[in-house]
Amino acid sequence: MAREKFERNKPHVNIGTIGHVDHGKTTLTAAITNVLAKKGQAEKQDYADIDGAPEERERGITINTAHVEYETDTRHYAHVDCPGHADYVKNMITGAAQMDGAILVCAATDGPMAQTKEHILLAKQVGVPALVVALNKCDMVDDEEIIELVEMEVRELLDSYDFPGDDIPVVQVSGLKALEGEAEWEAKIEELMAAVDEAIPEPEREVDKPFLMAVEDVFSITGRGTVATGRIERGKVKVGEEIEIVGIKDARKTTVTGVEMFRKLLEEGMAGDNCGLLLRGIQKEDIERGMVLVKPGSITPHTKFEGEVYVLKKEEGGRHTPFFAGYRPQFYIRTTDVTGQITAFTADDGSAVEMVMPGDRIKMTGELICPVAMENGMRFAIREGGRTIGAGVVSKIIE
């Protein structure tokens, strides 16, 4: 049977459900697909379909994630839901599931709990731009005042992590009752999705961002010059444009004199393309793997940064023993390993710790031996002798 063509007539947005264990994230996800399926905008999925998500590997880390897709009247959504708390931490830090926004699920019966806080903090640190709150299990709370108190508590919590607590929509839902087909609760799911359509901004497309390509390989072509190959991460580049080479050595500018893909010459390369760029006046030894080609001035090289890191457990192929401040691993950034040092660290909530155990999540300060093009939200892996022992995301650039 011929595959259906993916219709790109609606803007695409990536979202996910986050929140404390057993507050009903997966049930709510199932309810969304069931309610939208009645309008022909989704395929119905039940709790078991979503809960039995297969394992995936991202940067050498095993993560369980369920992916569902659905549409509203105005948008196409890809929605991720994770069964376990550890899966969320790994997912958000590795960027396996980049979220343009998230539905924070909080049970009205419990109010905000430990992981509610942790997921809000994680969302802030890894740069999830917008949230919508689903107060779930509202069918189980008879007293409207209790629901209002929980709502106030959630809003204050969001404020304390620098989300606009007063402005974020909070919708009272019951995932279970909506799944069971009760009309008033189905209407609440529609209200929730209308809030998501409204409050989660449409992401800027990769192709509209400033050009960036990480260099994977370099060739010199006799009589023509030097070609750098790689995958264009974002933006686009045209023949004749000036670009900058950033990282490892001093930054320098050059002009793109050719764009080549599958041995064909192109006028321009775009985000997602694997291509070669012919660079004017550049020698093969001027450029190496680990550098990036960028729109001039759009990104700068740095050596010192703070990051959020998940350290792999022994069972995940990580270290068997703890490490201490002063530990010197390799940081795998885009296409290359750069040696660096973890000069300091704390537990993820900022409390002091003496050492880092496999399976921990930490905030760390790192210092690289040579500058690398870096920006907030950039992902990296921490490696030791070629095997991944941790995954991280840059939360703040120091110098």
UniProtKB/Swiss-Prot annotation:
Q: Which GO terms describe its cellular component?
A: cytosol
Q: Kind of enzyme, top EC level?
A: hydrolase
tr-type G domain: residues covered: 10-204
Q: Does the keyword rRNA processing apply?
A: no
> Which stretches of sequence are listed as region G4?
136-139
Name the gene that codes for it: tuf
Q: Please state what the protein is called.
A: Elongation factor Tu
Q: Where does the record place the region G1?
A: 19-26
Q: Where is this region: G3?
A: 81-84
CDD domains membership = EF_Tu, EFTU_II, EFTU_III
Q: Name the Pfam families for this protein.
A: GTP_EFTU, GTP_EFTU_D2, GTP_EFTU_D3
